[in-house]
Regions:
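Ribonuclease/tRNase effector modules and their secretory precursors
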Residues: 1-91
Length: 91
C-alpha cells in the first residue's frame, strides 16, 4: 500500500493540529477502527480511521483504493473518540 497527500494540506495540518502526515503508515499497521465518512457528499468515498500513532490515538480522514491511501487530515482523538477506539478494539 502506498501513501500520498497534498503537500499544501500536509503543511496546513502540521500548523493546525501539530501532526505530520509523514509516518501515518504506522497507524494502518496496527489495530484500527474505520468507518465510512457520510457527513457530507465529498464526490468520493472517504473514510475515518482511528488508530495509534506514537502511542496516542489519532483520527485520520482519508480515501482508499487497492493501491493508495490518500491522507486528507490527521488530528489527535477527542476523549470520547479515544474511549470508543479502545472499546472497539477490545471487542
Amino acid at each position: 500500500m502506498r501513501f500520498e497527500w497534498d503537500e499544501a494540506k500536509r503543511q496546513s495540518n502540521i500548523r493546525k493540529h501539530g501532526i505530520d502526515f509523514i509516518g501515518t503508515e504506522e497507524v494502518f499497521q496496527g489495530k484500527t477502527v474505520t468507518i465510512l465518512d457520510e457527513r457530507l457528499d465529498y464526490g468520493e468515498e472517504r473514510f475515518i480511521t482511528l488508530g495509534l500513532l506514537k502511542g496516542r490515538v489519532v483520527v485520520i480522514a482519508h480515501t482508499e483504493t487497492d493501491e493508495v491511501i490518500r491522507i486528507i487530515s490527521v488530528r489527535k482523538a477527542t476523549k470520547n473518540e479515544e474511549t470508543s477506539y479502545f472499546k472497539a478494539i477490545a471487542d
